[in-house]
Swiss-Prot record:
The record marks R157, K213 as: Positions MEP for the nucleophilic attack. The lineage of its organism: Bacteria, Pseudomonadati, Pseudomonadota, Gammaproteobacteria, Lysobacterales. This is 2-C-methyl-D-erythritol 4-phosphate cytidylyltransferase. PROSITE patterns: ISPD (PS01295). It is an enzyme of class 2 (transferase). Catalyzes the formation of 4-diphosphocytidyl-2-C-methyl-D-erythritol from CTP and 2-C-methyl-D-erythritol 4-phosphate (MEP).
Amino acid sequence: MSVGVWAVIPAAGRGVRFGSPVPKQYLPVVGRPLIVYTLEALAAHPAVCGLMVVVTEGDLAWSGWTEVAGKPLLTCSGGVTRAASVLSGLLALPQVVHADDFVLVHDAARPNVALSDLERLLEAGCAHPVGAILAVPVRDTLKRAGSDGSIDGTEPRERLWRAFTPQLFRRSQLVRGLQVAAADGIEMTDEAMVMERQGLRPLLVECAESNFKITTPDDLVRFEFELARRV
């Protein structure tokens, strides 16, 4: 993978579901903010040439880092939603990032993406006409619930995947799709959904389950365990 890409990391969320007064991306993990692990995981790939972190305006928790692993780290202010923050990050990218360049978008609270998975995403996504996302096939049995909370049926899982990040798309297509969705008042929960709404079909690239998102305190404990395994 020789083509350089920038990564946009939306980090303007407040982590309401986590139940902490501190946004989860800044929670200390082995003495370091969670987001540092995320940034280092992305910067470890030689094809990632810069990072744009989208923070809340006036974010006092942000430490003002300007580089990671010798690569430039820029910041901009985000919006009320994830989609608005991603759009802000894409528009704030430096001039060296052209309209048709591929850009990675990655969750700030997903600190454990493997270098090998990132490599396969970049290889497959940059060779695909639309782009690609990391994802994991659904392996559990899925039940559909009725309005009373009882089981209403069992859903076939053979073609279902859980969408992870990073997600890799061309900057111009993602910007255009996000702007149209915002104008239409449609909430976009991930970047692949933005592309799907334009009639495009991104590629699914399987990744490790260890690339999970920190959503609950149990997830944080799990990540600490993953860190201990690295030693």
